[in-house]
């Protein structure tokens, strides 16, 4: 992996900086590094592809070195360099695609393609110029089974889940009470509702709770908590649990009371926040517990009183809600992230070249299914292909 990164970084710098008119002295160190890369690669043959519709390609390296000059780089010099650069970039692109197309149930973090395994050989260790990439550092740590720390912004940690539970129900579905939620990506929205607006509840208060277990623990998370769930703020028709009928939900939004959010790790409470909204932080957690109340307003204007009658029919449904959004966090496992294109890059390559479904990843790289059953094998393979995708993204946009 270090060799692949060093090759890509060298090629990116060469493509950007070896241009006509540049003083040789300004790029002399880069050209020496470039020549070291050529010397190491010359005389070697590689093969990529041969999986799905990814074509088999053979690569032979036999390039001359870039010379020195006392003046600016001229057009001929740059053209010679450009021919070499483009061949190397094409090679790296195909190595990366070949690697992203492959998976293994055992030692999935190690190189899987023939070309990538060859690049991992001892003779290429001289190509090791700059390995400051966060992904490379974490890949090295994970490869040695040591602690890693990926920093994510809006991590896709929650598998998609959208449903409801009813704590009070009737065949006519005309006096319901319960919760509904939507968990996806880095956000939880949950709403508690009571058609009768807690008219018969103790102290006219209904209590709601929503618990979400993460597939991987997060640390040092910055979180936004809001006393609203906008996705449940408009009327809708909902299929009943048994699919036999549908019921009407017509929310009128109230502010939730006694809001409490707990962050737990292995069943132990790590952080607790009560009636605190906006930005909060959580130190270390693998479970989130949200609890909140719907209180029937003790004093109402005639207009509000008309919304919440003492008896049926209940045409408007009292609703309270919360939104919890993870803005950034650290995780020891690699995750898809809304601010990165790595999952999209890997999925696009696998779809474009009709890569057959293997023993590790789900069809179409379905993220909800992948994160729901996030096995160590999937984690290893995902870290490898994401690292390769991050390297490829330096050269291929």
Curated annotation (Swiss-Prot):
Q: Which HAMAP family match?
A: Rota_VP6 (MF_04126), Rota_VP6_A (MF_04129)
Q: Which organism is it from?
A: Rotavirus A (strain RVA/Pig/United States/Gottfried/1983/G4P2B[6]) (RV-A)
Listed binding positions for Zn(2+) are 153
Oligomer and partners: Homotrimer. Interacts with the inner capsid protein VP2. Interacts with the outer capsid glycoprotein VP7. Interacts with the outer capsid protein VP5*.
> Where does the UniProt annotation locate this protein?
Virion
Miscellaneous field: The VP6 trimer contains a zinc ion located at the center of the molecule. The zinc ion is not essential for either trimerization or transcription activity of the DLP. Zinc-depleted VP6 has an increased sensitivity to proteases.
Pfam families for the chain:
Rota_Capsid_VP6
Q: What is this protein called?
A: Intermediate capsid protein VP6
Q: What does this protein do?
A: Intermediate capsid protein that self assembles to form an icosahedral capsid with a T=13 symmetry, which consists of 230 trimers of VP6, with channels at each of its five-fold vertices. This capsid constitutes the middle concentric layer of the viral mature particle. The innermost VP2 capsid and the intermediate VP6 capsid remain intact following cell entry to protect the dsRNA from degradation and to prevent unfavorable antiviral responses in the host cell during all the replication cycle of the virus.
A single GO molecular-function term is: host cell surface receptor binding
Which residue ranges are recorded for the region named Interaction with the inner capsid protein VP2?
62-73
CC per GO annotation: viral envelope; viral intermediate capsid
Annotated Ca(2+) binding sites: 266, 286
* Modification note: The N-terminus is blocked. Sumoylated with SUMO1 and SUMO2. Sumoylation of viral proteins seems to have a positive role on viral replication.
């Amino acid at each position: 992996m270090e060799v692949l990164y060093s090759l890509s970084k060298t090629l990116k710098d060469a493509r950007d900086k070896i241009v006509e008119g540049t003083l040789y002295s300004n790029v002399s160190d880069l050209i020496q590094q470039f020549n070291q890369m050529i010397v190491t690669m010359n005389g070697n043959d590689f093969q990529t592809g041969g999986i799905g519709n990814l074509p088999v390609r053979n690569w032979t390296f036999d390039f001359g070195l870039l010379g020195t000059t006392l003046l600016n780089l001229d057009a001929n010099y740059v053209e010679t360099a450009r021919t070499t650069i483009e061949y190397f970039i094409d090679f790296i692109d195909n190595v990366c695609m070949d690697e992203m197309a492959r998976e293994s149930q055992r030692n999935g973090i190690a190189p899987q393609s023939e070309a990538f395994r060859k690049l991992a050989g001892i003779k290429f260790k001289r190509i090791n110029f700059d390995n400051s990439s966060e992904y490379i550092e974490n890949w090295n740590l994970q490869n040695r089974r040591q602690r890693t720390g990926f920093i994510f912004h809006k991590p896709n940690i929650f598998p998609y889940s959208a449903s409801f539970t009813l704590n009070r129900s009737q065949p006519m579905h005309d006096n319901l009470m319960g919760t509904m939620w939507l968990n996806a990506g880095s956000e939880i929205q949950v709403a508690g509702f009571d058609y009768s607006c807690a008219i018969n509840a103790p102290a006219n208060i209904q209590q709601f709770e929503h618990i979400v277990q993460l597939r991987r623990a997060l640390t040092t998370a910055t979180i936004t908590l809001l006393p609203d769930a906008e996705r449940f703020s408009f009327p809708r028709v909902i299929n009943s649990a048994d699919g036999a009928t549908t019921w009407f939900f017509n929310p009128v939004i109230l502010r939730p009371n006694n809001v409490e959010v707990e962050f737990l790790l292995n069943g132990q409470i790590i952080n607790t926040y009560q009636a605190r909204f906006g930005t909060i932080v959580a130190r270390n957690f693998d479970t989130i517990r949200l609890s909140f109340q719907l209180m029937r307003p003790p004093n109402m204007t005639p207009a509000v009183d008309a919304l919440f009658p003492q008896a049926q029919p209940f045409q408007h449904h009292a609703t309270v809600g919360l939104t919890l959004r993870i803005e950034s966090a650290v995780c020891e496992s690699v995750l898809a992230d809304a601010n990165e294109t790595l999952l999209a890059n890997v999925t696009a390559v696998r779809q474009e070249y009709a890569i057959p479904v293997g023993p590790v990843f789900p069809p179409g790289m379905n993220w909800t299914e992948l994160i729901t059953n996030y096995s160590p094998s999937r984690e290893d393979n995902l870290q490898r292909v994401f690292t390769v995708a991050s390297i490829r993204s330096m050269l291929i946009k």
